[in-house]
Amino acid sequence: LIDIPIYAQTDLDEIYRIISKVNEEAVPEHPEILKEPDVLGPQMASNGQFNFRISMIVQGGMQISIYHIFYRLYHEALLREGIELPTLGPLSKGK
């Protein structure tokens, strides 16, 4: 699973478009991806952060490598298209 933090007011249609474009261009270059990525869309993490989630099925042992490659591709494409992404700070443990 790849979770990209997003703001609640982000244009989801635009994110779907950008993610789909990245997948069309990059997935064919990675035969270790066994099935077309499943774009699950917006999710809420337990800490209240909104994320945009993409699921991929890949060859065994390739999960971490593909995660890092595609997280970077998605992140760069979203920023290039003017989508603002939050930067998460350290989470408070509370008192």
Named regions from a protein language model:
Residues 1-95:
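Structured, soluble regulatory/oligomerization domains located on the cytosolic or IMS-facing side
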